[in-house]
């Protein structure tokens, strides 16, 4: 074997004559890539948890260890989250995201190697006055999980179906242990499963924005077009610019996939790919356009050459986004983009030149572009219900500079005032605006204990902040006409009514742990969102229930617990 001295790991390999370029007695050196140690390490599932959860089995009550039932709920009315987005009295929340997190946590079985690694990591993680000590974790329970349950925790997770509309203070997920003694395992992944709040809030805000977009289309057309046409046009009014807005790649990917339940325009193809795969690779799940970046413009000596290049390589009918503020927005639109759009109109090639400002005054720039296009004949005029409207043809806009719900509404109002239907002239690209204001506190997401022990003894929390209190359980969730009209959808299991929750996961079923709720595909969830946003009531809150749509029996038990644990608090606030 040869001796080599360089910066690579080198392995000498003898190739046979079948390669056709060496004799059997020849040797060829093959270089192997030299890599450093990894920076991203696969975290043991046991450590995907809060530190106080990992050690809590040591000091939990015997009843809680025997059996614990938890629920996830959103406790805040939406108008308190953002009055520019959510209308007063409309508390519809869209439930999504649970299946993906269960896939992340439990699809691959937990192994003894993960337990060993967890033990090594925790060997010095507890701080004491006598130095660092091992942090306790219930190793024996996890060894049993691997040996007896095929590596998946024996907990059952039930929830409403993804895409369902839910309301503040309703239970949306129920988590409980199945065999006795695993009660603390029902809380182990609290901090991770609770992260469904991000998916729910992303989809909820977009579902409400879609309702607003439909109102804009309806304002123009009224009943002269079908409901399906209204939804189609409304669906064109927003494009996800969020690929670079996320704090970590997983956030951008997951939330971008969620956004596609409502609006199909996206630049985040990692999320689009996930939605595509989860739809059975259906066509039309996501779409985008050719788009110039500032770097493309800067790469040409002449800005005009760049825009002409994009227009020339685009096929007939192409919709192309031209960033126009690299040097001077108004000059670029009037002297470069307008002539291109006019030439496209003359050639009748169907191409649309889309002017995209990325700095300046958005309202001024958008209205000015529409007026300029109309002035030069790049529009059609239609009279609808005795009102004249101008519709764009070969030059339109996409506005994506720091868009917020309030700013987009402001621009739309200005366009409508001047006879330009917003959906006929362009759309809004929203990146950070879709996720910058997402927060667990917005919906007041809570993972709460509601029952313990073999007898399922009800428990709840009475906080100093009224809206942070919880309910005694366990529960059923009803969706009958009677329950919705009476605003009493949360009941005990022994009360009348059919539970709409379904099983998602049961680790005690070692051969088929994933259940009905997990299996819905992207298209099924998307359709459920559309159906329920059209048919479910706006709210289940009234003056009598204090935003807790529960049965009288749950209220009675809650008052009993209040008298026992917090007798100085006013019962009228919890009845």
Task: Give residue ranges: language-model regions.
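Terminal presequence/propeptide segments associated with secretion/organelle targeting
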Residues: 1-14
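Buried, small/hydrophobic-residue-enriched core segments of structured protein domains
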Residues: 9, 16-80, 140-154, 158-385, ...
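Gly/Ser/Thr/Ala-enriched C-terminal appendages of enzymes
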Residues: 16-110, 268, 274, 278, ...
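Residues that form generic nucleotide/phosphate-binding pockets
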Residues: 104-105, 121, 125, 192, ...
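Short beta-strand/loop turn elements enriched in aromatics
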Residues: 107-150
């Amino acid at each position: 074997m040869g001796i080599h001295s360089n910066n690579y790991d080198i392995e000498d390999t003898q190739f046979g004559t079948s390669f056709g370029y060496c004799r059997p007695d020849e040797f060829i050196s093959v270089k192997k890539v030299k890599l450093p140690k990894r920076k991203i390490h696969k975290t043991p599932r046991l450590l995907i948890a809060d530190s106080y959860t990992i050690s809590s089995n040591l000091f939990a009550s015997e009843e809680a260890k025997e059996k614990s039932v938890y629920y996830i709920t959103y406790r805040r009315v939406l108008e308190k989250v953002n009055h520019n987005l959510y209308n007063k009295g409309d508390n519809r929340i869209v439930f999504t995201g649970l299946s993906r997190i269960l896939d992340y946590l439990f699809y691959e079985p937990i192994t003894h190697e993960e337990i060993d690694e967890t033990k090594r990591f925790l060997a010095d993680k507890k701080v004491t006055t006598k130095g660092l000590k091992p942090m306790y974790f219930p190793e024996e329970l996890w060894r049993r999980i691997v040996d007896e349950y095929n590596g998946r925790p024996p907990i059952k997770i039930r929830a409403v179906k993804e895409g369902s509309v839910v309301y503040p203070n309703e239970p949306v997920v129920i988590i409980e242990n199945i065999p006795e003694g695993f009660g603390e395992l029902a809380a182990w992944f609290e901090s991770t499963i609770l992260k469904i709040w991000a998916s729910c809030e992303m989809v909820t805000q977009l579902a409400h924005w879609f309702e607003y977009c439909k109102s804009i289309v309806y304002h123009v057309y009224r009943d002269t077009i079908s409901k399906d046409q209204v939804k189609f046009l409304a669906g064109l009014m927003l494009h996800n610019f969020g690929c670079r807005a996320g704090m970590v790649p997983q956030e951008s990917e997951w939330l971008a996939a969620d956004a596609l339940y409502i609006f199909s325009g996206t630049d985040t193809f990692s999320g689009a790919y996930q939605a595509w795969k989860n739809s059975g690779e259906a066509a039309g799940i996501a779409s985008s356009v050719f788009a110039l970046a500032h770097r493309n413009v800067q790469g040409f000596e002449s800005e005009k050459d760049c825009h002409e290049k994009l227009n020339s390589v685009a096929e007939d009918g192409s919709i192309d986004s031209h960033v126009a503020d690299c040097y001077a927005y108004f000059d670029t639109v009037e002297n470069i983009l307008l002539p291109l759009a006019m030439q496209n109109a003359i050639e009748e090639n169907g191409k649309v030149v889309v002017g995209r400002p990325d700095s300046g005054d958005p309202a001024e720039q958008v209205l000015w572009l529409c007026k300029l296009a109309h002035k030069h004949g790049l529009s059609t005029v239609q009279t609808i219900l005795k009102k004249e409207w101008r519709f764009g043809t070969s030059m339109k806009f996409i506005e994506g500079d720091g868009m917020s719900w309030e700013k987009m509404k402001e621009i739309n109002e200005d366009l409508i005032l001047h006879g330009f239907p917003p959906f006929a002239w362009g759309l809004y690209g929203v990146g950070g605006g879709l996720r910058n204001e997402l927060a667990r506190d917005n919906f007041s997401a809570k993972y709460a204990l509601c029952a313990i022990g073999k007898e399922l003894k009800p428990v709840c929390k009475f906080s100093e902040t009224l809206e942070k209190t919880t309910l005694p359980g366990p529960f059923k969730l009803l969706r009958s006409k009677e329950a919705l009209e009476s605003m009493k959808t949360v009941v005990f299991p022994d009360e009348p009514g059919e539970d709409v929750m379904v099983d998602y996961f049961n680790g005690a079923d070692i051969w088929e742990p994933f259940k009905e709720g997990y299996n819905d595909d992207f298209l099924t969830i998307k359709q459920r969102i559309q159906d329920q946003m059209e048919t479910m009531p706006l709210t289940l809150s009234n003056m009598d229930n204090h935003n807790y749509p529960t049965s009288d029996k749950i209220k009675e038990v809650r008052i009993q617990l209040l008298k026992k644990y917090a007798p100085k608090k006013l019962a009228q606030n919890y009845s």
